[in-house]
Amino acid sequence: GTIKIVHFSFKEFLEDNGFYKYCPEGGKHYVFVKVTNNLIDHTSEKEIKDFILNYLIKIDDLTVYNYFADQVRFFREEFLCLLSTIDIFFIEDTKDSAYLYYQNCAVKITNDKIEPIDYIDLGGYVWKDHIITRKFKMCEDISCDYKTFISNICANDIERTKTMESTIGFMMHGYKNLSYCPAVILNDE
């Protein structure tokens, strides 16, 4: 029989598998993205084509595979612009909390708590390239080589160590008050 692609069904299939357009805030041009469990990754026409062709290999339908392999127009930007534009709320640090992203979970850090959160429960999106390439593991022991190093460069002075820890925390934290932008300058004695 004749193979006919229903454009709307093809669009729905791609969106059901996480492919969308995204227009960055203040931008005029969109990019293609793939969303998986609140993680967003840039994608391209080539990666979308590879996804479709690999899917067709898995379902073992070479007739449709050959059709798509020949019909490059389905993977051009002009055709893929049919994808819906996704409205994205990115998780951001607040005055009272910061987030770090690991391979196995996100971690919400507040003054008195470190809380692992599954990405699906995060309540917003995260760029996949913001993920630290290791798994998060909660540690009961708070001593480590880095903490010893910071204490040593502060001459084991508790007050200086707290100041250095506060400075490092300030620089790592994503929330900034734009009316307060101090320069951090370190010098030795």
Question: How does the language model describe each region?
Answer:
Residues 1-124:
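Intein modules and their embedded homing endonuclease domains
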Residues 20-37, 41-46, 106-189:
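P-loop NTPase catalytic core of nucleic-acid-dependent motor ATPases
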